[in-house]
Amino acid sequence: MELVHQQQQPSHLLSLSPSPSPSPPEQAPLHPSPMATSSPKTCFVTIGATASFAALIRSALSSDTLSALGKLGYTDLVVQYGQDGKELFDSAMQQVKTAGSSSVNVTGFDLDKAGLGKYMRQAKGGGSRGGQEGVVVSHAGSGTILDALRIAVPIIVVPNPDLLDNHQVELAEALAEQDYVVHGKLERLPKALQDAEQLRQRQKAWPPVNAGVQREAKGLKGILDEEMGYLD
C-alpha cells in the first residue's frame, strides 16, 4: 500500500488566510464618576429640626461645593433640609440637573422621626454598606455635634448668622480650637471640606493630644460644657 506523506508547512511561513482583525480596546470614559471608580463616600448635611437654615442648603448645593466634593472622591450628598426647606431644595436641585456637571449623587429629606443617626453612620462609612469615611456638615446645634462626635465622624460646624445670639459661633470656635471640629463658613464651604480631610487624619489620635486624662474622663458633654463656660 502506498503511503502518502503530507509535507508540513515550515513554521516560519505565515499563513496566507486572513486572520480576524483584533477588536479595538475599550476606552475609559473621559470623566468617570466617583461612583464608578471608588467605594461610596458620603457627605451628610443637616440643618436640624428647630430653625430653618436656607443659606446652608444653598451653599451645600452650589456648583463650587459639588465640584469640591467630586474632587475629594465623594459619591453621595445627603441633605436634611428641614420642614420649610423642600421648595428651596427642589429649586436648587433643578439648577444642579440643568448644569449637569456634577458626578455626585444628591438626595434630600425634610425630617426623620427616627433621628439622624443612620445618616451619620452612612457618612462614617464601613458597616454593612461599606465605603470610605466621609463628613457631616451641620448647623452649630450642640445635640447634633455630640451625635457626630459619638459616632467619630469628621464634622464641619457652620453657625447660622441669622440667629439673634452668637452662641453658635462661640461653640464652633471653641471646638475647632481644640481640634474636635472644623469651623465652617457659608461662603467657604469648599475650603472647609478640604480642612475636614486634614482633620480626619488628626482625629486618628482621638482624643486630641491636649485633652488630657482628666478632660477625657468628663466625656463629650463635659468638654462642651467646659468650652462654653458651663462649669460645675
How would you name each of these model-derived features?
Residues R150, N160-H183:
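Active-site-proximal loop->helix
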Residues T107-L111, Y180-A192:
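Short acidic-hydrophobic, aromatic-tinged amphipathic segments that line or gate anion-handling sites
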Residues V153-P154, A174, Q201:
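Acidic/polar active-site rim loop that often engages polyanionic ligands
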Residues E2-H5, P10-L16, P24-E133:
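Donor-nucleotide binding loops and adjacent catalytic segments primarily
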Residues L3-H5, P29, E197-D232:
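C-terminal amphipathic helix plus adjacent low-complexity
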Residues M120-L164:
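A donor-sugar binding/catalytic signature common to diverse glycosyltransferases
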Residues V78, T107-F109, V137, I156, ...:
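Hydrophobic/aromatic beta-strand patches that form the interior of the parallel beta-sheet core
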